[in-house]
Amino acid sequence: MILAIVGMAMNMSVHAQVQFSKFKFYVADIMDFSHLQLETKFKVTSDRNLKYVHVFFTPVNGVGDAIVDEIRGGVNANVKHTKFHHIYATGPFESKKSYTKHFDPYYIGGKKPTPFPYKVVVDYMGGGSDTILVTKDNIKTYFPCLKWIDVDYKSGFQPDN
């Protein structure tokens, strides 16, 4: 039983479907330092072409707390603050090639946060998908550009999420 689990874990790390060499926020508007864009660069490491790449992440401050986005502009009672974000890139993405994508806007106050991924989903051309939960043991396989953070999801401002 233990050998089977170890074998599965080794198999998962060997068959990484996508690897991110860049996953970070940068200031998108020098007049408003809380207006951020997410810049990503990834390589398809799968032998199959990808249709979509989804990344689920949370912004994290310098002390490891998950932080919420801010709402700018008019008041909208239907908009919720959230600590959890989802981006997806639409392919096709060819095997063994690299791609750069930008996502925005994010309005996050305070010092520039770190976008910290917790799940990746890849959808393949022709059907099928894989879900990867990002862990301390596999973060360098999928996000070698990031260090592991023990994220505290309970501290700080608590919206209804």
Would you name each region that the model predicts?
Residues 2-4, 14:
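Cleavable N-terminal signal peptides
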Residues 31-33, 59-71, 77-78:
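Short aromatic-acidic-glycine turn motif
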Residues 108-161:
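Surface-exposed edge beta-strand/loop patches
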Residues 32-40:
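Short, solvent-exposed loop/turn segments enriched in Ser/Thr/Gly
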Residues 10-16:
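Sec/Tat signal peptide C-region and signal peptidase I cleavage site
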Residues 47-52, 66-68:
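Short acidic/proline- and small/hydrophobic-mixed sequence motifs that coincide with surface turns
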Residues 72-130:
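Short, solvent-exposed, Trp/other aromatic-anchored flexible loops in extracytoplasmic proteins
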Residues 41-49, 61:
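Asparagine-centered strand-capping/turn motif at beta-strand->loop junctions
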